[in-house]
Curated annotation (Swiss-Prot):
The keyword Cell membrane does not apply. This is ADP-L-glycero-D-manno-heptose-6-epimerase. One of its GO terms (molecular function) is ADP-glyceromanno-heptose 6-epimerase activity. Homopentamer. Belongs to the NAD(P)-dependent epimerase/dehydratase family. HldD subfamily. Its cofactor is NADP(+). The active site is at Y140, K178. Its EC number is 5.1.3.20. Contains a large N-terminal NADP-binding domain, and a smaller C-terminal substrate-binding domain. It comes from Glaesserella parasuis serovar 5 (strain SH0165).
Length: 308
């Protein structure tokens, strides 16, 4: 059996899809379906069972026997960078992850988890997987940073794979439930379908992010499991592109509309990453050699999926 936490969420459901593609359907999805919209991400996927997150945590703490587990992909967390309830974030993103990590270590179960580029904070270069380059700007980033630090201390003694991925700007199918936290490509497409012009913040041609297509993210996770990879790795394309490039790709697909600019919100100015670009040196050195989709390629594929 394979367990995917956050399995009805954005990245989790894409990992389930990738597992299905290699013939694995013996999958336990763990999630919180309080946001009932997420169920649609599982409708076309094959899984063996579903477990509520709270029940799962209780079972983990109790040391319950789940039978033979080949791997746990831990994608379940609060991913809202705008969430400021620190107690909630630390419980949800840090304590839960520690419990699951030790459950895996005790049983030598390969453990793969979601970290984030938010751990780097507002830096404009050297996005390198080391403590000295990490300075998160928000509580979400701090919760991910602290778990990375916890893992770093444990890795030298771990007898089974423990692997974290610092996800950069992930976009693509199955993110529709995320609301305001969905990608800019999703929101621009929605605006055009409503008959509106797509809107970008002022200066968006200078805001550069490492936009990575979610199917590529899922493939890296599968590769890490199949190759028993351990460590903490950046997961982006290695190339920063502008929000304007995303908008241009959306407009190219729809063949209509023109970009409108709107004022940049004051409350985000000190907490906004204006540049991100994954340094892939460590991931490539570990053996991952497949190319990543560009913004033009990924956005085109995403638009075809959204407008199918």
């Amino acid at each position: 059996m394979i367990i995917v936490t956050g399995g009805s969420g954005f990245i989790g459901s894409n990992i389930v899809k990738a597992l299905n593609a290699i013939g694995r359907t013996d999958i336990l999805v763990v999630d919180n379906l309080k946001n009932g919209e997420k169920f649609v991400n599982l409708v076309d996927l094959d899984i063996a069972d579903y477990c509520d997150k709270e029940d799962f945590i209780a079972s983990i703490i109790a040391g319950d026997d789940f039978g033979e587990i080949d791997a746990i992909f831990h994608e379940g967390a609060c991913s809202a960078t705008t969430e400021w309830d620190g107690k909630y974030l630390m419980q949800n993103n840090y304590e839960y992850s520690k419990e699951l990590l030790h459950f895996c270590l005790d049983r030598q179960i390969p453990f793969f988890y979601a970290s984030s580029a938010a751990t780097y904070g507002g830096r404009s270069d050297n996005f390198i997987e080391e403590r000295k380059f990490e300075q998160p700007l928000n509580v979400y980033g701090y919760s991910k940073f602290l778990f990375d630090e916890y893992v770093r201390k444990i890795l030298p003694e771990a007898e089974s794979p423990v692997c974290g991925f610092k996800y950069f700007n992930v976009y693509g199918p199955r993110e529709q439930h995320k609301g305001s936290m969905a990608s800019v490509a999703f929101h621009l497409n929605t605006q055009i379908l409503k008959g509106e012009n797509p809107k970008l913040f002022e200066g968006s041609e200078t805001f550069l992010r490492d936009f990575v297509y979610v199917e590529d993210v899922a493939q890296v996770n599968i590769w890490a499991w199949q190759n028993r990879i351990s460590g903490i790795f950046n997961l982006g394309t290695g190339n920063a592109e502008s929000f304007r490039a995303v908008a241009d790709a959306v407009l190219a697909f729809h063949q209509k509309g023109q970009i409108e600019t709107i004022p940049f919100p004051d409350h985000l100015k000190s907490r906004y990453q204006t540049f991100t670009q994954a340094d892939l040196t460590k991931l490539r050195a570990a053996g991952y050699d497949k190319p990543f989709k560009t913004v033009a390629e990924g956005t085109k594929a995403y638009m075809e999926w959204l407008n199918r």
